């Protein structure tokens, strides 16, 4: 009689291998927060097929799909069925060299060719315009003031020159007249004789002194002044002679003769100065 050997039903190895493979494919960014609890296996019990399908669905649900525009190659060590993606930082670092290769180097150099200009404010432009206008106005004022000053100085110079010329002409005339009068004084200061025609005249000086003397009708008024200076021992410059008769007459031109001035016999004449001093 054959004896029955004890049959040990061992758990299938395939299920354990599949479960470990599924657990390795699950992307766990944080092992503390996202930890999948595997069901405990018992000896002599086979795991249901539902567990395997759930693990695959969880893996497909949690794995983000890679961007379609940028293909990438898997490393040779990784299995083609693995669903663990690369980190986003690593993908961005892989994309940067490719973008740098696509962008030409001439563009960046052309942008940095010229330095950045400072910003131009409108206030600065207005202030500069105001300053330029003020400078132009001040320069115009200075030029006009200089022109006026030059004109005034020119007119003053011309007026001074004219006045000097006039004064020189007057002095020359006076010198010539005094020379002529001096020559006439030297020859006619003597009193005329009884045989000559003569006029008796009384002469009063500016100081009030009087003298009586005979003069010729041809004697001029300067001779009368010279005789008065000789008698009073003084000099009378810029003087004139007036008559005491009414109406009074005044003679400033001393070159005229007594006959020309129509001075009669026994007349009273007074010498007055042009500066206001004279007989009362």
UniProtKB/Swiss-Prot annotation:
SMART domains, alphabetized: UBX
Effect ascribed to mutating residue 244 to A: Reduced interaction with VCP
Alphabetical list of Gene3D superfamilies matching this protein: Phosphatidylinositol 3-kinase Catalytic Subunit, Chain A, domain 1 (3.10.20.90)
List of residues that carry Phosphoserine: 87
PROSITE patterns tied to this protein: UBX
Ranges for region Disordered: 41-94
InterPro entries xref list: Ubiquitin-like_domsf, UBX_dom
Any GO CC annotation of this UniProt entry: endoplasmic reticulum
Any Pfam family hit: UBX
Sequence ranges assigned to domain UBX in this UniProt record: 194-271
CDD domains: UBX_UBXN10
GO annotation terms (biological process): cilium assembly; ERAD pathway
Single Gene Ontology MF annotation: ubiquitin binding
Entry keyword Phosphoprotein: yes
Keywords noted in UniProt: Cell projection, Cilium, Cilium biogenesis/degradation, Phosphoprotein
Keyword Phosphoprotein belongs to the record: yes
Annotated localization: Cell projection, Cilium
Role noted for this protein: VCP/p97-binding protein required for ciliogenesis. Acts as a tethering factor that facilitates recruitment of VCP/p97 to the intraflagellar transport complex B (IFT-B) in cilia. UBX domain-containing proteins act as tethering factors for VCP/p97 and may specify substrate specificity of VCP/p97.
Subunit relationships: Interacts with CLUAP1; the interaction is direct and mediates interaction with the intraflagellar transport complex B (IFT-B). Interacts with VCP; the interaction is direct.
Family: Belongs to the UBXN10 family.
Protein's name according to its UniProt entry: UBX domain-containing protein 10
Organism: Homo sapiens (Human)
